[in-house]
Curated annotation (Swiss-Prot):
Primary role: Involved in the gluconeogenesis. Catalyzes the conversion of oxaloacetate (OAA) to phosphoenolpyruvate (PEP) through direct phosphoryl transfer between the nucleoside triphosphate and OAA.
PROSITE patterns, per the entry: PEPCK_ATP
Native species: Rhodopseudomonas palustris (strain BisA53)
Cofactors: Mn(2+)
Family: Belongs to the phosphoenolpyruvate carboxykinase (ATP) family.
InterPro entries (alphabetical): PEP_carboxykinase_ATP, PEP_carboxykinase_C, PEP_carboxykinase_N, PEPCK_ATP_CS
Protein name as annotated: Phosphoenolpyruvate carboxykinase (ATP)
Lyase keyword on record: yes
Recorded name of the encoding gene: pckA
Pathway: Carbohydrate biosynthesis; gluconeogenesis
Gene3D superfamilies named in the record: 3.90.228.20, Phosphoenolpyruvate Carboxykinase, domain 1, Phosphoenolpyruvate Carboxykinase, domain 2
Keyword terms, alphabetized: ATP-binding, Cytoplasm, Decarboxylase, Gluconeogenesis, Lyase, Manganese, Metal-binding, Nucleotide-binding
Main location: cytoplasm
Family matches, as SUPFAM superfamilies: PEP carboxykinase N-terminal domain, PEP carboxykinase-like
Length: 537
């Protein structure tokens, strides 16, 4: 077996049972990985130097193919209501079959950190079959100094073999695609998919399991910090504006997706960004556009012009989930340390397509826990069915697929941190106003930015608030530069009776969704539900 690159010779591939390999390329950089990927036909170059790849039949994560080992350690610590299980014996069979499948392969190995805070980071070793997968994870996680590689001992090991095909009967899974996590052995096996995001989210899931016991709240969020050191956290599901609103030229970007909140502040789990790039333009998002069109970037499933090799970001023929992976240092105002102080503001973003939520509301710690556990946004049904009625989306803690522990673990931690540090918490509606989708209009981005600026700089602390009759949270009645009517959603509707019906309908959806959390929370959080306010009428 031929091994090249800087590595810990005493802790090589054989420690994990990887034997009879053609070789291992240890910790190669971007130029090497470009060469390997292009030579193997894994991708092509764009005109500006990005590596363009197709991920095959899987153009996104496959949650139904993700499994966690159920053993004596995880029986009582994993949230089995939201995670699929396999036995330790099934995992061992899968592991041995992975090792057998890898024989004769030339693998790539990266030694990386998950987490910018040395006190809480997890040393992660990733073996991949494909060169571009090695480049991807090297870009997304945090790279040690070269000198540290010679003594690197991993705490978490990921083996990603895209050509492996699982056997449902033999391995206890549902299909040939599999992502299996053994928290006890700290091993992740990924097979049957070329979608690189599975690696990144496996590290996130692992940190979500271990960090709460260390007093750190892991979060699916973006974060930035102002010139005075005031940190802000932005929770939000896809399409709510999390990336756009946290990218503020007047504030330093900490990260766009995964963070931890510990006793000393907030830290990024990653060293790169993984941005959706459908309809990406230089005009709307100049920093992301520039970062995506340069050497070192990876473009997933993006259509290239066959002659000019320029990417067509408007072409979603392969998937709407086109992605760009690039190093954080490609963003001009990004923090390279990945660390900031304790948050002063927490923002929960919701694109309310029902048009009944105010553009901004202030939450109590109990209300914050309620809305964090709810994880609400709304999407519009596809026009191919001729339906314009919005449908609610609830993803607990704004990251349900990545939560190995009971949601109340994360919810209680957030509530306690907000109360302990006197953090202001805001719910921001980036969705519709003046009616539901199809009748109303999208909340003006200028209004959202003005309200966010006022929230983050403390201006909203000095205004008058009213209590929303449906949701019970506090809503500002006026703010200089913002039309007062837009702050009270009922005033933007022509049909007031229709507003009442729609608002009550959405409250009912919240109630139905939250019923599964009733037993997890205390009386104060139960009282923070919308139903408590309506029942009092």
């Amino acid at each position: 077996m031929t091994e090249t690159g800087v590595r810990n010779g005493a802790y090589g591939a054989d420690k994990f049972g990887l034997k009879n390999l053609a070789g291992v390329t240890w910790n190669p950089g971007a130029p090497q990985l470009y060469e390997y990927a292009l030579r193997a036909g894994e991708g092509v170059l764009s005109a500006d130097g990005a590596l363009c790849v197709d991920t095959g039949i899987f153009t996104g994560r496959s949650p139904k193919d993700k499994y966690t080992v159920r053993d004596a350690n995880t029986e009582s610590t994993v949230w089995w209501g939201g995670n699929q299980s396999i036995t330790a014996e099934q995992f061992e069979t899968l592991y041995q079959d992975f090792l057998k499948h890898a024989e004769g392969m030339q693998l790539f190995a990266q030694d990386l950190y998950g987490g910018a805070d040395p006190s809480f980071q997890i040393k992660t070793r990733v073996f991949t079959e494909m060169a571009w997968h090695s480049l991807f994870i090297r870009t997304l996680l945090r790279r040690p100094e070269t000198a540290a590689l010679a003594s690197f001992v991993p705490e978490l090991t990921i083996i990603d073999l895209a050509s492996f095909r699982a056997d449902p009967k033999r391995h206890g899974c549902q299909s040939e695609n599999v992502v299996a996590i053994d928290f006890t052995r700290k091993i992740v096996l990924i097979g049957g998919t070329q979608y690189a995001g599975e690696m990144k989210k496996s590290v996130f899931t692992t940190l979500n399991y271990y960090l709460p016991d260390k007093g750190v709240l892991p979060m699916h969020c973006s974060a930035n910090v102002g010139p005075d050191g005031d940190t802000a956290i932005f929770f939000g599901l896809s399409g709510t504006g999390k990336t756009t609103l946290s990218a503020d030229p007047n504030r330093t970007l900490i990260g766009d997706d995964e963070h931890g909140w510990g006793k000393d502040g907030v830290f990024n789990f990653e060293g790169g960004c993984y941005a959706k790039c459908i309809k990406l333009s230089a005009e709307a998002e100049p920093e992301i556009f520039a970062a995506s069109n340069r050497f070192g970037a990876i473009l997933e499933n993006t259509v290239l012009d066959p002659i000019t090799r320029k990417p067509d970001f408007n072409d979603g023929s392969k998937t709407e989930n086109t992605r760009s992976a690039y190093p954080l240092e490609s963003i001009p105002n990004a923090s390279l340390t990945g660390r900031a102080g304790l948050p002063k503001n927490v923002v929960m973003l919701a694109a309310d397509a029902f048009g009944v939520m105010p553009p901004i509301a202030k939450l109590t710690p109990a209300q914050a826990m309620y809305h964090f556990l709810s994880g609400y946004t709304a999407k519009v049904a596809g026009t191919e069915r001729g339906v314009t009625e919005p449908s609610p989306v609830f993803s607990t803690c704004f990251g349900s697929p990545f939560l190995p522990r009971d949601p109340s673990v994360y919810g209680n931690m957030l509530r306690e941190l907000i109360a302990k540090h006197g953090v202001d918490c805001w719910l921001v509606n980036t969705g519709w106003t003046g009616g539901i989708y199809g009748t109303g209009s999208r909340m003006p981005i200028k209004v959202t930015r003005a309200l966010l600026t006022a929230a983050l700089n403390g201006s909203l602390r000095n205004v008058e608030f009213r209590t929303d009759p449906y949701f019970g949270f506090a809503v500002p009645t006026a703010l200089p530069g913002v039309p007062s009517d837009i702050l009270d959603p009922v005033k933007t509707w022509a049909d007031k009776a229709a507003f009442d019906v729609t608002a009550r309908k959405l409250v009912g959806m919240f109630q139905k969704n939250f019923s599964k959390f009733e037993a997890m929370v205390d009386a104060e959080v139960r009282a923070a539900q919308p139903e408590a306010k309506l029942a009092a009428e």
